Each structure stands twice: as structure tokens, then as C-alpha cells.
A protein has these predicted regions:
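Conserved flavin/dinucleotide-binding core of flavoenzymes
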Residues: 27-45, 281, 285-286, 296, ...
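Glycine-rich active-site loop/strand segments that organize a redox cofactor
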Residues: 33-44, 91-111, 153, 185, ...
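Dinucleotide-binding Rossmann-like beta1-alpha1 core, especially the glycine-rich loop
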Residues: 99-152
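Glycine-rich FAD pyrophosphate-binding loop
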Residues: 76-98
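Active-site/ligand-binding neighborhood in enzyme catalytic cores
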Residues: 147-257, 262-273, 277
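Extreme N-terminal leader/targeting segments of oxidoreductases
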Residues: 2-59, 77-85, 399-413
Length: 414
């Protein structure tokens, strides 16, 4: 190659490098400028929220699960809502899903960490729990089977069960990965293989397991914090029905609002050991909000509400044995109502049966994040939007993601 051509190519390479560096520098400047603008806007929005006068406005929260209690915390923290104007209606602990193992992912756990940071006596304690003992790591024979599964088209897996696929490597059913899938996704050996494959795409480790006792301790700290803030926790109380108003009859959901709540409260007659009940009708005024864990009370209230409007989801998709909701069916995504249904003026949903674009619906992260999403959108606090557009992956990115998923499962000691 002549010297002149070499010099020309060198000049072109240098120019290309300088152009790329200039482009990266410009992009970083714009990114920093946007971050500063966002920070300034956040400060202004926070000041506006702090200066609000809520007057006689009230918040009614249905259910005393982790997500319901978290909603009360976010009302106080993000919206500076007076605790004395918050009412939480709940049944017993088990009925509200507070009795089992709680799984926490370290990915996207900012909301969970921030919530725990608001509770005296929690904080680091929650994140120093040892991983549940008894499980084993993935073996060398398990990883190739997982790789083949992730690379197989889903349409070819519908007729197979998880046990069929791993019949040659039964060791996987003794690992922490399988325990995690049972806790987070409710999978069994005879579960559909395509559903198991979809679950693997959602796993981002590492995960921590909170025992039922540790979960109860977190719930206790939440209630203790809320009582100090003046929140009225009405236990042994059930919201049996609600009355909805739809300001637009064309089915779009515009103007959807809760107008009345019907409450049944249990009393105990000490002298006779008989149960007595008090029934109450609550009228919601303009500005009042209603936040519902639609899985509480076996989903009976959600079923009644869903019959009134299409925007409130399809609880029938989750009905299992004994006509009870099965929260361990996370992939009925479109059957879940958004944390704030389209057009809703004062109704929000939290918990495993509400819809967020990201996250495993049976983790502590999801419970806390759904509560924050519903509260901030209903109260226009601006902390976070309820959802984002789904991103499409190219074939190359898909293979890279497969590799990352398998590697993360192995590194997570699952």
C-alpha cells in the first residue's frame, strides 16, 4: 500500500475516533444536563407536595398485607399525607397473605430498601437474613438442561411438564432454584414447562428468603410505625362491598370512582363468648382515595368490583380450587388491573394481583413497588409511573440474555 494511502487511512481512523469521542462527550453532557433538570424538578415537586393542605381528605386502604401497609407508609412519606386521615381495614394475618415465606430480590429493590429504612429497628436487619438452608446449588448436569430450555421455542413446550424435561436431571428439584420457583411462581413438578421457562426469564438474582417469623417481624414493625403516625388500623374488619360510579358510560373507564364502602366489623362479647358484628356504610367525598389489595379476603371484593367495569381486571383467570384466588399464577399479566386503572379518579390496586411492567409478582419488591406506584399516581406525587413500554429484543440480544440468565442462576448459589 502506498504511503499516501496509509496516511489517508490513518487520518480517517483518527477522525472517526475523534468523532466518536465527541459524540460520547456530547451525549454525556446531555445526560448530565437532563439529570440536573430532573433533580431540580424533583425538588420543586417535593416542595409542592409538602405544601399541600389535604383538609378533610381521607385514604381508605383495604387489606393489611405487606403491600397495603406499604401503601400507608408511602402516603405519609411521598405525599406527606396526615396519618390520622388514613384508615386500614384488615382481616386476620393469614387471610391477608402475611403468613408464608417472603422472597426478596436484590435487583430493583430500591423501594423495599427505602421502606425498611423508614422503620426503626429494621433497615439492615432485613438484609442480613441468611438464605434458607436445605437447598443445593445447580449441578453441572442442570445447567445444560436449563440452557436448552431457554433456547427452545415456547410453542414446542406446551405439551410437556417440568418433570418431563428434567427427567434425566432430577437433581434440579433439590436445588434452591426450584425452591425459589415454588415460592415466587407457585410451580410444581407437573406444571407446564412453558410457564417454567417464562419464569426463568424473570429471575434476577441473588434472592434472599425471609422466614414466616421474619416476615411477621417486618409486618409488626410496619404496624408499629403506622400507629405512631396516627394511622387507624382496624383489624378483624372486612369491606364486604363497594359502590362504583362511572362518569362515562361508553366503557372507556373515564371518571371511574369509588363512592361507598360497606364495612363489617367483628366484636367480641366477653360475657357470652359470642361474636357480634357492626355494619357501617362509608361515603367517600371528593378527594378521598381507596387503595385495595385485590387479593385480600380471597378476592371476593375484587370479583364484585370487576363485574362492574372491564378496567378492573379478570379475577376468574386466577380462581383455583375451593373458588379461591391462586396468587401463584403470575403470568396472567393482562388479567391484572393496573395499579391505577385507566380513568380512575380515586381507586388503586396493590399487591400480587396488580399490574406492574417489571418484577416477580410474589416477591417483597413487587408488593412494595406496586404500593408506591398506586399511591404516587393517585396522589399525583410524581415519584413513578405505573408502567413503561415493553422493549423488543433482537435475536443477538436474546442469546446474550440467555447466557446472562444461566450465569446469574449459577453465580447466585441457586
Amino acid at each position: 500500500m502506498p504511503m499516501s494511502d496509509k496516511k489517508r487511512w490513518i487520518r480517517l481512523a483518527v477522525a472517526a475516533g475523534l468523532g466518536a469521542a465527541a459524540g460520547a462527550w456530547t451525549y454525556q453532557i446531555q445526560k448530565d444536563k437532563k439529570a440536573k433538570n430532573d433533580a431540580r424538578l424533583a425538588v420543586v415537586e417535593a416542595a409542592v407536595v409538602r405544601s399541600r393542605d389535604y383538609g378533610k381528605q381521607k385514604a381508605y386502604i383495604i387489606g393489611n398485607s405487606l403491600s397495603s401497609l406499604a401503601a400507608a407508609v408511602w402516603l405519609i412519606k411521598d405525599c406527606h399525607f396526615p396519618g390520622s386521615s388514613i384508615m386500614v381495614y384488615g382481616e386476620n394475618e393469614e387471610a391477608c397473605g402475611n403468613a408464608g415465606l417472603l422472597v426478596v430480590s436484590r435487583e430493583n429493590c430500591e423501594d423495599f430498601l427505602e421502606l425498611c429504612g423508614k422503620l426503626p429497628g429494621s433497615g439492615e436487619k432485613v438484609f442480613t437474613f441468611p438464605k434458607t438452608e436445605g437447598g443445593e446449588r445447580l449441578g453441572c448436569a442442570d445447567l445444560p438442561a436449563l440452557w436448552r430450555l431457554l433456547c427452545t421455542e415456547e410453542e414446542r413446550l406446551d405439551v410437556l411438564s417440568v418433570e418431563d424435561w428434567f427427567s434425566g436431571t432430577p437433581h434440579i428439584f433439590e436445588t434452591d432454584l426450584w425452591q425459589l420457583c415454588q415460592c415466587v411462581f407457585g410451580l410444581k413438578k407437573d406444571s407446564n414447562l412453558a410457564e417454567f421457562r417464562r419464569s426463568l426469564w424473570e429471575l434476577k438474582g441473588p434472592f434472599l428468603f425471609l422466614s414466616p417469623e421474619e416476615r411477621q417481624e417486618l409486618i409488626r414493625l410496619l404496624k408499629q410505625y403506622l400507629r405512631r403516625k396516627g394511622v387507624l388500623l382496624l383489624e378483624n374488619t372486612q369491606v364486604t362491598d363497594l359502590e362504583l360510579e362511572n362518569g362515562n358510560d361508553n366503557g372507556s373507564g373515564t371518571g371511574l370512582a369509588v363512592k361507598k364502602l360497606y364495612v363489617k366489623r367483628r366484636l367480641q362479647e366477653e360475657e357470652t363468648d359470642r361474636e357480634a358484628f357492626v355494619f357501617e356504610k362509608i361515603d367517600l367525598r371528593s378527594g378521598d382515595v381507596c387503595i385495595m389489595d385485590n387479593g385480600s379476603g380471597s378476592g371476593k371484593l375484587w370479583k364484585k368490583a370487576a363485574d362492574l367495569h372491564i378496567a378492573l381486571g379478570e379475577p376468574e383467570a386466577f380462581v383455583g380450587e375451593e373458588d379461591k384466588l391462586q396468587p401463584l399464577r403470575p403470568h396472567h399479566f393482562t388479567d391484572r388491573p393496573k395499579t391505577v386503572p385507566t380513568g380512575s379518579r380515586n381507586l388503586g390496586f396493590v399487591g400480587a394481583f396488580s399490574r406492574l411492567e417489571e418484577g416477580c409478582c410474589l416477591t417483597g419488591n413487587y408488593a412494595v413497588a406496586s404500593a408506591r406506584s398506586a399511591v404516587d399516581e393517585l396522589m399525583h406525587a410524581g415519584r413513578r409511573a405505573a408502567g413503561t413500554e415493553e422493549k423488543r429484543q433482537s435475536r443477538i440480544r436474546k442469546w446474550i440474555t440467555v447466557y446472562k440468565v444461566v450465569c446469574s442462576l449459577y453465580r447466585a448459589d441457586l
